[in-house]
Amino acid sequence: MKTLVTAVLFLCSACVLAAGNGVKVPPFERLQLPNGTVVLLMERHDVPLIAFSAVLRGGAVSDPAGGSGVASLLAGLLQKGAGQRDAVQFAETVASVGGQIEAAASTESISVSGSFLARDQQLMVELVADMLQRPRLEQEQFDTLRARQIEFIRAAKESDLAALAPIYGESHLFGAHPYGRPVDGSEASLAAIKHADLQRYYQEQVGADRLIISVAGDFKSAQLQQRISSAFSGWRKAGTPLQQLPQAERVASRNVLLIDAPESVQSYFWAGNVAVAKKDPRRPSLDVTNTLFGGRFTSMLNTELRIRTGLSYNASSHFDRLQQPGNWEMSSFTQTETTIQALDLMLATLDQLHESGLEPALVESGKSYVQGQYPLALETSEQWAAQLATLEFYGLDRRYIDDYSAQLGGVTSADAKKVIDEVIPPSTALSIVVIGNAAAIRDGLRKYGPITEMKLADPTFAPVRAE
């Protein structure tokens, strides 16, 4: 095996402890192939299943300028024929053994994940290797998928404006920074993408040195190492180096993007700013604080906008933590006639958080909630395969999981106030996006800051710049 892999083999110990002691990372092995591919293997023999997560660094941030959606299209095409199998044969092969495979793009990666019976591990490795190394990327399949993706966006503009608000929001907040690119593209950017653009992306942005393969389940590590090494050690590296991204700048004042949806009887609003990266050490305090402000049903935001006033059916906030600082955002929706009232209340609730902080009893409640939810995300082989890939992707070690419960237990009201002051933006420094009937709400929105307008019918998610 030493001739096949670099001698970077880690045997990690400990197991999942009782809930009161928190979650610990079970034993797993890490190895790196000579071409740069990282392989993570965690044996779990509770059920005869194997789950995998194969992650390629890159994603939407590596889309060409003006070509947002290329990574997403590539992810969609990985299952539409690979190796000796066309799209139908590939799907039938997976289904015939009761397996599951799906591919998706995100801001910073393209991932392929799935699960198979333990007896089918050789087929699993073969299919994943074909998808990544030998995708067919046929013109006809490309044309069909691109047209379908454009239709999905148009359908969302007719029936799911809530799903579009954060896309407009992040595009508005990050501007020309790659984090502002819509992962699935826009009507305009998708229409401009050619088949050759997708092939070029595959050659330049996909390769062994970008790949993390994480597997958890019922297998013998030595045997699976050999199979993965045989299937992937000969793969080429990506044609270009991985782009190193700069930090995005926080907005220092308020500004508004108004998207005119004249037929809508509701307004959908989003507000956010640049916040923290995945590796930020204040994670426990941030998680507790956000949970209490907008991360659970009884949060401050939802209590004010739904439970107490009935202005909305839902109001929430969350962090998007990436390699570089991503965004913190809050969002909700309401009837057109109560748009300004609801937005005022959302901003006032944020002011309350900054002015009063969080009382110790409330912090204890938030800690208990997060402590109870966290283990539920680390129970199955599918979850562990994904989690190991995430740790590797962001350069995090096992302490990110092992120490989390104890760190949560130590969060105080003072810690919460510190991250509120340092990370959560004040109501005076927000990018605000509102989708709604502009004629009915434009004048009321003027008090929040300078307004930039566009139409829902516009084929982009930004008013001027190329996506």
Indicate where each model-derived feature is located.
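Non-catalytic, conformational "gating/processing" segments within enzyme and secreted inhibitor domains
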Residues: 166-167, 195-231, 425-429
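M16 family metallopeptidases and their MPP-like homologs
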Residues: 42, 47-75, 86-133, 150-152, ...
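Short, surface-exposed beta-strand/loop micro-motifs that present aromatic residues
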Residues: 29-30, 38-43, 199-204, 253-261, ...
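Positively charged n-region of N-terminal signal peptides that target proteins for export
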Residues: 1-5
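Mature N-terminal segment immediately following signal peptide/propeptide cleavage
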Residues: 22-55
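An aromatic/glycine/proline-enriched structural segment found at the starts
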Residues: 21, 175, 212-277, 434-467
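N-terminal signal peptide c-region/cleavage motif recognized by signal peptidases
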Residues: 13-14
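Peptidyl-prolyl cis-trans isomerase
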Residues: 134-142, 193
